[in-house]
Amino acid sequence: MNTKLNVLFVLFSSLVLAQSKDGYWDNIRTTNETIVLGAGKKKMIKTADFPLGTTEVVYRISILDDNQKISSSLVSVLKAIPDPTGISQGSAGAVFLASTISGDDKCKYVVFTNEKDALEYEKSSVLKNACVVQNEPINKEAKLLSEKSKCLNGNQNLWFVFESDNWIMKQKIVFEVVPWVDYKFKNGWTNAAKKELLSEVEKND
C-alpha cells in the first residue's frame, strides 16, 4: 500500500510540474534537407534522431524556384518562441512559421512512423499506417506535432515521403524539422513509462 502511495505521489508531482513546460528547442539535432524532386516522382526522407525527452516536433516545408532562398531558417524563427504553447494549432500559427518565400510549384506529402511503410508508399503508392496525409498540393507548410499526435509515440524518427505535383519539371523542396525537448522527460520519464509503472503497481496491489 505504501509503495502505491509513493508512486501516486511521484505521478501527481510530475503532473503539477507539467503545467509549466520547461525545455528547449534542440537546434543541434535538427533536420535540414534540400531535396531535388523529379517531375511526378516520390522521395522518402528520414528525420534526424529525436533526442530523449522530445515531446513536440515542428516541421516546415518550402517549395522554391531555382533562384529562391529561404530568408530565415526554422531554427531562427523558433528562437522567438520560448516553448510550443506559443505556437497556435490553427492557421495563424502555421502562417507565422511558414516561410515568407515560396515558388509556384507544389507537392503532396505523407508522414510515417516506420521505414517499411514509408518505402512501400514511395515505391508502390500503397498507403498504410500514415500519421499525416497531405493530399492537397501545397507550396509551403508548417506544423506542430504534439505528444498526442499519432506521429510521436516514443519513436526516434519520422519518415516523410514527398510527391511532386509538377509533371513536367523538377522541383526544389527545403525540408526542416526541429524537436522540442522537455526537461522533465529527458531521463525517460514519459507518459508511456508512467502507464507501465501504474500497471505494475496495480498488478502487485
Where are these regions (language model features)?
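Bacterial Sec-dependent N-terminal signal peptides
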Residues: 1-22
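Acidic, Ser/Thr/Pro
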Residues: 19-205
